[in-house]
Amino acid sequence: MGIQVAVRQDEITDLVTRIRAAIREELNVSSRGLPFRAWDISRAGAVLHMTLTPEGRNSVLDETLEEGRIGWEGETTGSAEVISVLPALSVVNACLTTGQPPKEGSLVYVNPPRYLEALLSLWEDGTRAAEIAQWIFDLGNNRIVWDKKVPFSVFNGLRPAQERSFSLVRWKTSFLWGPPGTGKTHTLGRLLASYLVHHPTDRVLLLSSTNVAVDLAILAVDDAIKDLKPATRPVLYRFGSRLDPKRFQDRKHLTPLRNRQLVDQLRQHYETIPDPAEAELYRKWKQERDRLRDAIRKENLEFLSKARLAAMTTTLAAYDFANLGKFDLVVFDEASQVGKAQAATFALLGKRVLFAGDPQQLAPIAQAASPDVNTWLGQSPFEWTSRSSLKNATCMLDEQWRMAPPISNAVSNLFYGSRLRVADPLSRDEVWIRGRSAMPSRLLGTQNVVLVDACAGARAAARFRGYECEESALLVAALVVDHVLSWSIADVREDIIVLTPYRAQRRRIEAELTTVNAPASTASTVHRAQGSERRIVIFDPVCPTADFVAGEEGMRLVNVAFSRAQCRLIVMLQRGWEQHPALSFLAKQHPPMVLNRDRVDELLLTKLPGPRPTRPA
């Protein structure tokens, strides 16, 4: 194993003190809740359905808020427990626990599950905290500590960088950098499958911060093992009660339960929530809910020691940290979206650790503003890769399979130091080439990357925080109609996505799409789009001079938006775009154009075929 870096006790103590203080500060600030506006509120018994729009820069609606709490007017008027979050629709389903539902348009505060409390309790154990701090200092002496190999030749079609990534697990700490379209999850699945099959006594802990990421990662490993057809199949288990039952319908071997109906029973139980006003009935309902949760957790723990690979969320791992034991390898997927304090904590569970993610896309979110909170909770472990001891332990996947060459070049030059390229085999793939060839339309030519000057500026939004631009919203609707008709698109939502960083602009675009009979759900905010891809992406930055779009985090949003596109990327330009680093760079290769106004007006009078969509969600 690696040699520990000699560190004075006072240095250990100082680091522990600073990280503890950072967690406490973030816990204190986050306990106030993330601010949202509640709209479209309906009630069925004790279940509330509502659309939430963010009121703060850090108010991101995703599934990590499940099992959190919602309060309004300081929780003196009412509160609810979050049952489920549908990020694509900005919808939350919650169980009313006190008071009356919030009023339309009122301010509500969402408190995430008390994950930080569990993290803080781990750091308040003096011995454990000192061990984690020592692990952090030892990064300066990172080295190869495992002399075995993980074969990659057992799989066909791996690219050179993917093959190189199989050697990462030999290092004490390593990083798999997966830019968009490079097949990070696919690679990770094959790496871990080969590792488990060829090293039958080793155990792996697979972590991620969201249930969706955990599901997709373990399914990738399971698929790869299926391809290998080993004589003895390694035991993989997905722990936790928040897995997606549909994904695991034909994968019962991944569910660590003797009574495999427990998860279904829990979901069905949530469909029968009584009105909290019926106190006794509600009390019994909560008792049964807790009984089912405890039964799932108890059975999970009984199966833990049998698992060669245990997959779970970091939230579950934080609460069950003491029961997890030690693993030969800890793999942290989407690690670029968690803070360094969390990453170091869970790294302690393994002899070796592999962090996988993309530091150029969405970063961890911390609400408190102090330097230590930013360093330990607002920066990902990928910040460590600049150290000389970690450079050789980092592998970037450099061939992508999604974007047409001009889009790929733009993303590569802007965000990946010109290292990302179209996968070599695709140069001979006629089907792929045809699918990435942009056809002309009434408004555009055959370019893959198009910059459209809206000849207008952003305005402060009336109903929501942020900005909106009516002129660009109209042009976006015309461009959608143009491509549906010119490209004979049957399902708009399958082929086109409209991305914007501002909810106000999303609502305005949704309204314009509705007038031309296009699905309002074609429009999305950038945060919700990570992980998706479409043939055509229209990106509307709305206010290119705002720090939210032009700052460091804004550039990450731009990267996410650009890299969703397969065949055509259309970028709307408002006044001030010349000051935006990415937009001004792009304009040098792709000169902005002004759309023909008469053709735009004609397209806006067109009604697309099909049933009229429902009003925006």
Residue ranges and their predicted role:
Residues 1-36, 40-164, 239, 244-272, ...:
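Pre-ATPase regulatory/linker segments immediately N-terminal to the P-loop/RecA-like helicase/translocase core
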Residues 171-191:
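Walker A/P-loop
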Residues 154-172, 187, 312:
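N-terminal pre-P-loop "Q-motif" helix
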Residues 193, 203-329, 364-376, 427-434, ...:
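Conserved P-loop NTPase motor core of helicases/translocases
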Residues 73-90, 95-99, 212-224, 228-246, ...:
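C-terminal, active-site-flanking charged/polar segments
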Residues 201-202, 210, 315-332, 336-617:
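Conserved helicase motor core of SF1/SF2 NTP-dependent helicases
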Residues 169, 191-195, 217, 349, ...:
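Hydrophobic residues on the short alpha-helix immediately C-terminal to a glycine-rich phosphate/catalytic loop
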Residues 170-176, 201-202, 308:
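Pre-Walker A (Motif I) flank of P-loop NTPase domains
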